Amino acid sequence: FFDGDGLVYAVAFDNGELTFKHNFVGTKGFTDEQAAKQMLYKGAFAIGNPKGDAFYNPFDFDVKNVANTGVVDWGGELYALWEGGKPHKMDPTTLRTEGEADSVLGHDLEVPQMAAHYRVLDADDQTKKRLVAFSIEAQNAPLQANKCCFYEWDADGTPAARAPFGGQNATGGIFHHSLA
């Protein structure tokens, strides 16, 4: 259920006609599995061997980026998002995947995972909207510091602000109109 590959769809009205289009997000895992015609990688909630064999390494925590949690269309660009990996840039017209993104709307990602839960907030003067998102890299080792970076973009996609931070047990999130 939660491990399915991302599917992006668009519905539009054009001269009184309804159009519908969709496309799977062409992640590496998706394209590899389509070529092999079988599951090759675990998703975040899968257990065992994706091929169904009885033998597997229970300590292998690598999972594929399914790009199935969120989609952001902002400043003329379209991204498919998943909490545990890089966003995938897509063509907003054809919905074809252009590849993993190391930057989003002009902001280079401070860490490779871009959260899939962004917010659109009112700007200071209340006449414009701003997109707010963050990237985070949690460390599993007790003495390593977590890394996080918050980003803001104007309505046209221009980078407006960037705030990197980190530290022991540093976590954060966007709640309604607040940053915690």
Placement of each model-derived feature along the sequence:
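Beta-propeller domains
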Residues: 1-180
